[in-house]
């Protein structure tokens, strides 16, 4: 048998045994030493996992939409569990550089340590949130493949539950979930046998996956950058056309501050790569003459922005003037996000606020999905 195929089969068997076999229970006490940094900048070790009645370890990914769904359940139950001797530790397992751009399309944040801090502040996490994305020590020891997933250990450090946090179609009934009932049983002092539930969520990205991310980045860098002339009629069509999903317009000139344009275009290019598979569209409109066309393309190529790129004369912008926010003392560059129905959303003159723009794009896409 092919050696590579044999290894794949053996890996699969190991996962199945771990998930299904009661004899495959693990103990916190048997885990190798680990040192994980929390968003509170404290270092957590195995000795911190010392709940009087048990310990709950939950692996979450910032970018995983299923993980995001269960944040409230964890936040709202944390104090109760802690006061009854159950410690909760949430851990982010992903190797950040292996995450593909479009895998971030359902989150306003990625999985870096700094973005974990932002998520903890944004959602008011009241539990320890630890980073294992760099070395993935505990992630590998527990054979974590999918987030979210929960490991519940009893007061003797024995694993008594592995599986999902709850049901995504029953978010308001978390108290009836298998995990919640197991925790209540531990609090009541009951002796429990190991059980598991089926996982669903987002695959964990490991350092070995970075080659895939690099290949994708290379393909992006090879995408053809084109620019075409637009008159007022065509530009107005793009602006007024009703769509299911939002679109972003960026108006600029070759006379704008070079660094400002570069940073704006790089930000827009990044978000276009993240959100375009969800239906997000980007239009860049350079106000300038045809003899500058090659220079325009060069600027866009440096930003790797393979969107709908247009150029036009200043006299063709009459119908687009209403998109410009009434701020600033110069005309360009300006940015405007428009909903599918034409409503004006995020807009600015000058530097793009990357966080505000991403939040606006994400919210608009989510709203559009809910209308489908």
PLM regions and their residue ranges:
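Bacterial N-terminal signal peptides that target proteins for export
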Residues: 1-9
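Bacterial N-terminal signal peptides
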Residues: 8-17
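Non-globular targeting/processing and membrane-anchoring segments
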Residues: 22-55, 164-247, 360-372
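N-terminal, post-signal-peptide region of Sec/Tat-exported proteins
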Residues: 36, 42-89
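Short active-site neighborhood of thiol/selenol oxidoreductases, capturing the structured segment around
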Residues: 47-70, 183, 238-262, 268
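Conserved helix-turn-beta segment immediately C-terminal to the redox Cys motif
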Residues: 69-92, 245-246, 262-286, 301
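Thiol-based oxidoreductase modules, predominantly thioredoxin-like and allied folds used
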Residues: 85-110, 125-135, 279-293, 305-317
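Short, internal strand/loop/helix patches
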Residues: 109-147, 152-153, 159-160, 297-332, ...
């Amino acid at each position: 048998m092919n050696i590579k195929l044999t290894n794949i089969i053996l890996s699969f068997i190991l996962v199945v045994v771990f998930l299904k076999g009661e004899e495959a229970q693990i103990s916190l006490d048997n885990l190798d030493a680990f040192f994980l940094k929390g968003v509170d900048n404290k270092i957590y070790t195995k000795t911190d996992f010392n709940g009087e009645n048990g310990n709950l370890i939950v692996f979450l990914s910032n970018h995983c939409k299923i993980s995001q769904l269960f944040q409230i359940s964890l936040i709202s139950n944390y104090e109760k569990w802690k006061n009854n001797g159950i410690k909760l530790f949430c851990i982010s397992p992903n190797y950040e550089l292996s995450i593909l751009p479009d895998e971030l399309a359902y989150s306003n944040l990625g999985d870096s340590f700094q973005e974990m801090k932002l998520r903890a502040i944004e959602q008011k996490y009241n539990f320890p949130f630890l980073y294992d994305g760099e070395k993935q020590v505990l992630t590998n020891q527990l054979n974590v493949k999918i987030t979210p997933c929960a490991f519940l250990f009893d007061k003797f450090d024995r694993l008594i539950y592995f599986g999902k946090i709850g049901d995504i179609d029953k978010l308001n009934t978390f108290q009836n979930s298998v995990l919640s009932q197991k925790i209540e049983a531990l609090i009541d002092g009951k002796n429990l046998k190991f059980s598991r539930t089926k996982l669903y969520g987002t695959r964990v990205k490991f350092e070995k996956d970075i080659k895939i991310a690099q290949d994708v980045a290379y393909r992006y860098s090879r995408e053809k950058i084109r620019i075409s002339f637009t008159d007022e009629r065509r530009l107005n069509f793009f602006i007024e056309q009703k769509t299911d999903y939002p679109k972003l317009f960026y108006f600029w000139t070759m006379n704008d501050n070079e660094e400002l344009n570069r940073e704006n275009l790089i930000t827009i290019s990044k978000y276009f790569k993240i959100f375009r598979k969800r239906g997000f569209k980007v239009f860049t409109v350079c106000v300038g003459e045809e003899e500058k066309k090659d220079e325009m393309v060069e600027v866009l190529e440096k930003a790797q922005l393979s969107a709908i790129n247009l150029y036009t004369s200043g006299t063709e912008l009459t119908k687009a003037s209403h998109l410009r926010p009434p701020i600033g003392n110069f005309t360009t560059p300006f940015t405007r996000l428009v909903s599918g129905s034409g409503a004006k959303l995020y807009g600015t003159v000058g530097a793009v606020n990357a966080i505000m723009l991403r939040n606006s794009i994400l919210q608009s896409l989510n709203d559009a999905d809910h209308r489908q």
